[in-house]
Each structure stands twice: as structure tokens, then as C-alpha cells.
Amino acid sequence: MKAVHFGAGNIGRGFVGLLLHQAGYELVFADVAEELISQLAAADSYDVHEVGDNPTVRTVDNFRALNSATQEADVVAEIATADVVTTAVGPHILKFVAPVIAKGIAARAAGLAPLQVMACENAINATDILRDEVAAQWDPAAGPLEAVAVFANTAVDRIVPNQEPGKGLDVTVETFYEWVIDRTPFGDNVPVIPGATFVDNLEPYIERKLFTVNTGHAAAAYFGFEAGLSKISEAMADQDVAADVRAVLDETKELLIHKHGFNREEQEAYVEKILGRFTNPHLPDTVNRVGRAPLRKLSRHERFIGPAAELAERGIVPEALLGAIAAALRFNDPADAEAAELAQIVASSTAAEATEKVTGLTPGHPLFAAVEALVEEVKAEVKA
């Protein structure tokens, strides 16, 4: 079995690549970072250090590495004979890897089983995004795309912080992970990935992860940044920050229980597990890293506005989520390009204009006025 994985960064090596290796796949990493690809190509193996209550070191070998920009033909050839293609590149980069994937699918010999494609990104239905981008590159004369490739959405969860300098290819990750995959597109030919969980209805798991892990993690970052703290574990050790994060997750918990029918005790236990992960002192994760890209995180269907809007539509005022949104609006990390752009939008627009532009909410939405009031507060603070 062979898997081609796009994105040889920390998540690619420390999560998706590791699980594919453990499943017995021959692994081909594809990336455009030349230094990283050169290091991988020259290495026989790398180690994944799982830190937490039961620390473990896992070694990954039997891999190759290719530069998908300068060695495109080689990547196409690998896809042409692969069983699985995965990505961990970021949702906005999927459109750039799609042309290579399309060429690889087109190069597959007749009679091969359909290529199994899964985007492992922090976005809802990321594989649908990738499928649409591949379809846009597909030549209809080659026949229907769905006859030669199967696209399945996934929900992925593992905290992989920025790595300390000088560690080379080794990656430090938390012990917890979750890779949930939609079983239905595969029919009787489900991929062999023992570390993954296959389900018939993925949406509840995607939203549970996004509205608990991603919402809570980012809330800890923004509240922690406001409190002048540097690490996520330090933020969660602060009683006020921890209480604010818990209040946010109490709101999303209620939404998830009522929307998807999760068992209350199981969902409460899930929240406790997630909060425990954020306090892991062995993960050197910073509020700046977790809080980066606030424009994306404040967008319409993301971790804050998404659940807050649904609660507002149900007649519930999401006070804690609004507090997190306010903290995100104040995230002014000078090293973050999106933070600078967010500040510029808030400063140069009316509160209503900024609310609509940043969040995608329309003025008639039941959440709009509350967010507009927060933007007005932030504008006043900047002027003061």
C-alpha cells in the first residue's frame, strides 16, 4: 500500500504521516518547502515524541519526499500508483495542490481501484473543497472523476505546537489524537487505517471537534493574550481565563447536545478531556500561535461566529462566545498579518461595515447587533 501526503510540516509528520506509517503504508511526502523536503529526502527516519501522562517515542521510516513544485512529474507518477492521497496544508492551500492531484489521477492506469482522497484540515468538509478544486482541473474527456477517485471528508484532532529550534525532523505532539473519516463514499473498499475511526455521519463529529477543541483552544489564546500570558498552559492555569474558556464550551456544549443529540454525560466528559489537554505543561504552545489568523477564525462558519450565530437563531444570547469574539477582535499580535489586517478593517470602517466584512453576518441576523456593539467598543478603545 502507498500513500502520498501533501504537507510535510509538523502535523503531516507528527499526525497523519505517523498514522499512515503505522497502518503499513509506504509514505511519500510532498511539499514546496525545499529545505524541509531536502532534510526528509536525506533522512532514513524521524521520531514523534508524544508527551503527556504516558510519554512515548514513535519512529517513522519507509518514506520518500518530493518537492511538488520542482518535482511535479515525480509527484504525479507517485499518485498514479498510490492507494491513498491525504493533505495537511491548510484549507486555503488546497487549490494549489489540486492541479497536481488531478494530473496524478489522470495518469492512473485503467483497472486500478479508485484513488482514495482525504483532506485532513481544520475546516468543515475540507475534502469537498479539494474535490471541487480537482474537478475544476479535470478533463471531462477522461471520463467521470468519481469513477477514478473517491473523496471522503474527515475530522482531525491533535495538538501539534511549533517545534523548538534545532530538533530537526523530530516532532513533539500530545498523546491524544482523533481522526474520524466518513465511511460512506468508500462503499465496501474502506481504507485500512487502524488509527482512524470510520463513521456513517461525519457532521456531528466535525462540529463537535470544531466547536469544542478549536473554539476552546482559540478562546484560551485570545483570553490569555488579553491577560498578558504567553503559553496556553499558563493561560489555563489562570483562574479567570480558565473560567471564561469553560463558559464558552458550556455554550457550545448545549448547542451540540440539542443539535446533534449527543449524550449529555458523554459530551460533558468530552469537554473535560479537551480542557485537560489545554493544560498540558509538556506542550510549549503559545497564545500567539494558537491565536494567529484571527480573520479566518472570526469568519462566518468558523469556531466563534458559527456556534454563536446558531445559538442566537435559537433565541439564546451567547454571552461567553461574545466575550471570546471581543477578545479575538483585540488580538493585536504585531507579527500576525491577519491581526494587522483586522485592526485596519476595524479602524477604517464603521462598526456595521466591519462586522459584516469580518464575520459575514448580515445586518438582519439576530447576532449582528451584539457583535456590532463589540466592534464599536474596540473602535473606541483604539481612539482613546
Swiss-Prot record:
One Pfam family per UniProt: Mannitol_dh_C
Catalysed conversion reaction: D-mannitol 1-phosphate + NAD(+) = beta-D-fructose 6-phosphate + NADH + H(+)
GO cellular component, one term: cytosol
Cited InterPro entries: 6-PGluconate_DH-like_C_sf, 6PGD_dom2, Mannitol_1_phos_5_DH, Mannitol_DH, Mannitol_DH_C, Mannitol_DH_N, NAD(P)-bd_dom_sf
Broad enzyme group: oxidoreductase
Gene3D superfamilies: N-(1-d-carboxylethyl)-l-norvaline Dehydrogenase, domain 2, NAD(P)-binding Rossmann-like Domain
GO terms, molecular function: mannitol-1-phosphate 5-dehydrogenase activity
EC number per UniProt: 1.1.1.17
Annotated GO biological process: mannitol catabolic process
The entry's keywords: NAD, Oxidoreductase
Binding-site list for NAD(+): A3, V4, H5, F6, G7, A8, G9, N10, I11, G12, R13, G14
Family according to the record: Belongs to the mannitol dehydrogenase family.
Annotated NCBIfam families: PRK02318.1-2, PRK02318.2-5
Protein's name in the database: Mannitol-1-phosphate 5-dehydrogenase
Gene of this entry: mtlD
